[in-house]
Structures are given as structure tokens and as C-alpha cells.
Amino acid sequence: MWHARALMESRCATISEKRRPSARRTARLLITALLAAGTASAGVQTIDPHALYPEGPLWDQGRLLYVEYAGPGIKSWDGKEATVWWRKAHCGANGLIHFRTDHILVACYDGNTLVELDRRGKELRSIDKDSSGQPFVGPNDFASDGHGGIYFSASGVYDIKAPITGKVLHLSADGRDIRVVADTIHYSNGLTLAKDGRHLLVAEMLAGRVLSFPIAADGSLGVRSVWARLQDLALPTPNEDAYDGPDGIKLGPDGNYYIAQNGSGRVLVVSEDRKLVRTISVPTRYVTNMGFGPDGADTVYITGAFDPWKAPYPGAVYRWTR
């Protein structure tokens, strides 16, 4: 997620020349789009039309949990209605993940903390710094390391002109050690373990690209490389500007990567070899994240905001079915 409350006056740039596709690239992308499965929007159903800047959808115990960044905390959707499940003032909840079998971690972007909950929503602890004593700045999203530990992004400042301070940190499986494993990322956002289990993909939102890091045996990350640039995956939409980019990213049960393109109202579904498989369009322009239910990739839950510039920051949660 990106956060307009911290940057109301700054977002006035249009797409820069370096992000504008060339004529040859545009033609190639157009052919790719026509050959791909196409835009999948007919199967989109709104399940919460009144969500306040929703994010972080997570299937849990037969229900969908998701956060409201501009709301009280976490909501639960049981298949019929959405209710508030957990509240915390000044949190600015932004991401969710399972931890320690039946616990849940919450990223509090505004509170600069991680909160650990039990299965009933009872707060067990709050963490605001890494093991070296450095405070978190904008905890944003999570990914499993495949061994019980967690990677999470600490985005830094959402300003394209600000110093580049985004980080990725690793939380050990026992919950005792938290260390920085990557830094100088231009607003680190969504992240996911790659299909091979040996790389971590990280959305570098303000650079408009997804990075890949090799994972060492101790969970540390090696030298980064560019996995994909969004401008190489799909044609730009009419209203894109320099702040639009990848938000949440997930490896789907079907082996494809799902990238929430914030500012473009769509999720890009991309194959392992970086080819566009399909796009899923939703009514909210500012798509933040997506998650999967028990049906695997046949059901995708998508969160997004209509207006991130003005309170109460209205948004919606969708269910896309194939």
C-alpha cells in the first residue's frame, strides 16, 4: 500500500519519459495482451462495498480477514457479511500473515509496529524495533520464508523525491530475532517467496519494478536483480503517473505471480517466465493487494481504494472467480 495521508501535496507528476514505453515496446505489449487470456473482470463480485482503505486479505479458519488502514483494524467476512474482528487505535493496519501455526501478525504502518495476535484476536505483544534497536519505519507487508520465519517490508517515506530508505527485515521462526536483510529500496512494498523457494521477490513501488533476491541458508538475502519492470509487462492505463507501481505481490496456487498495480485498477497475473497471462480489473483504481481462498487460484480476493486523498478513504473488497 502507499499512503496519501503523508503525501497529499506531492503527487502531481505524470509518467516520466523513462517509464513511457517506446513505440516498439508498445507494439510488443499490445500483441502480448491480445494473445494473453485477456482482461478478466466479469467474475468480479463486491463483498464489502464500504471498506476504508482495505489491504492484506488473508483466508483464515473458513473466513476472509482483511485490514482497514483507515478503519478500526481488522474485519472478518464470513461469506455473507463483514464485521470488525480486531481494533487498535493509531495502528493504520496494513498487512496480515499467519505466524506460529495459529497466530496472526499485523503490520501497523502508522504505529510503526508489528502486533502478534492469538487465534481469538487477543494481543500478545507489540514490536517496534529490530534486534539492533533500530525502529521500524512503515511496516507494510509480509511473506513467509518457508521455514516458519517471516520477511516483512518497512517501506520508508512515500515520496519519490525523498531519500531511498525502504527495507526488508526477517523475523526468525521463534520470534526472537529481527534483522535487516535488504535496504535502499525505493519504497519496499509487497513481497513473496518465489516458486523455486530460493528467491524473494520484492515490489519496489516507486521504481515501478519487482526485485529478486537470492536467499541464503540463514535467511539473509544476496545481491538483488530486477525480476520485472511493470512497463515491460503491460501497457499503461490512461491515468498512470510516476507514483503508480507494484503494491502487493503473491505467488498464486497456480504457479503464477499476482501483482497489484496500484493506480491502474488491475491485478497483473504473470507467469514464471515474466509473460502476462491475464489482467483482473476492478472498479477501484488504487488496488492494494490480493489473497486466495480454499479454491486456490480459482478464487482471488482483491482489495483497493476509490479515493486515497480524502477521508474517509473509501474502498472495497472484491471476490474474483474463474
Language-model region placement:
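Beta-propeller domains
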Residues: Y66-V84
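Beta-rich, blade/repeat-based domains predominating
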Residues: D48-L64, Y69, K88-C108, T113, ...
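Short, solvent-exposed loop/turn segments at conserved positions within beta-propeller repeat blades
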Residues: Y69-A70, Y109-D110, D159-G166, M205-L206, ...
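Beta-strand initiation motifs
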Residues: A42-G43, K80-V84, K122-R125, G175-R179, ...
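Bacterial N-terminal signal peptides
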Residues: R28-G38
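A short loop-to-beta-strand structural motif that recurs across blades of beta-propeller domains
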Residues: G73-K75, T113-V115, K167-L169, R209-L211, ...
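Short loop/turn segments immediately following beta-strands, especially the blade-tip
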Residues: F213-S220, R322
